[in-house]
Design a protein with these regions (language model features):
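Alpha-helical adaptor scaffolds
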Residues: 102-185
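Long, contiguous interaction/recruitment modules in multidomain scaffold/adaptor proteins
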Residues: 1-96, 102, 109, 119-122
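Structural signature of alpha-solenoid helical repeat scaffolds
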Residues: 61, 95, 133-134, 167, ...
Length: 204
């Protein structure tokens, strides 16, 4: 007779609880949480997931720390105006997690600060696809990136960037103000006025 072999595939997830909310996020091939988070119930957690504390301590945690150090290193060099060392640090972070929002913003800002619009365009295209880029925790980076797109005369990209943000949050008057500023530079006065009025309706 023939023997059937059963193969079991293990998927690793990073699970975090804040208050009553439990969220899980898949681990990428480098063992860091990456990609969209999903909210699950306590019942789901207990029935579908098994804890792996040793794997977390030996594989996941060290990689998460390495990623965090690389991003912080990049931020620190970028703030000092040392854009080439910053780029190297962000690059390293992106080899660990290419979807890391802070590293993508960081390297994008580094390119924009150097006036390297071709490379900034690549990062812009990646960022508009990452929903995480538009979350409140990254608001200051989001704003800085949008302003730098405008200052580098990447007006079309700047507008597309703010429109993408508006798909996820319609009630932020600052987005309409920022769009109006870009449209003023682009000499699109009617759209500029429309967006200013919209901003005023949201925050009279």
């Amino acid at each position: 007779g023939t023997t059937t072999r059963k193969t079991v595939q293990k998927n690793f997830w990073f699970v975090e609880q804040q208050g009553n909310v439990i969220q899980c996020q898949p681990l990428n091939p480098n063992y860091v949480p990456s990609g969209p988070k999903r909210t699950i119930t306590l019942d789901e957690l207990l029935s579908k997931f098994a804890p792996e504390p040793e794997f977390y301590l030996n594989s996941v945690f060290p990689k998460m720390m390495e990623l965090q150090r690389s991003v912080e290193n990049g931020d620190s060099h970028r703030e000092k105006g040392d854009t080439f060392t910053a780029e190297y640090a962000y690059d390293h972070a992106l080899t660990i997690d290419e979807e890391n929002v802070r590293a993508n913003f960081g390297i994008g800002l580094t390119y924009l600060e150097r006036g390297d619009t071709a490379r900034a365009q690549d990062i812009f295209e990646r960022l508009v696809k990452l929903d995480g880029a538009f979350e409140p925790e990254h608001k200051h980076l989001f704003n800085e990136f949008g302003i730098n797109l405008r200052k580098n005369h990447m007006l079309e990209q700047s507008l597309a960037y703010y429109r993408r943000a508006l798909e996820l949050t319609q009630n932020d008057e600052n987005l309409y103000m920022n769009m109006a500023r870009v449209q003023l530079e682009a000499k699109d006065l009617q759209s500029c006025i429309d967006n200013l009025l919209h901003a005023l309706r949201l925050a009279p």
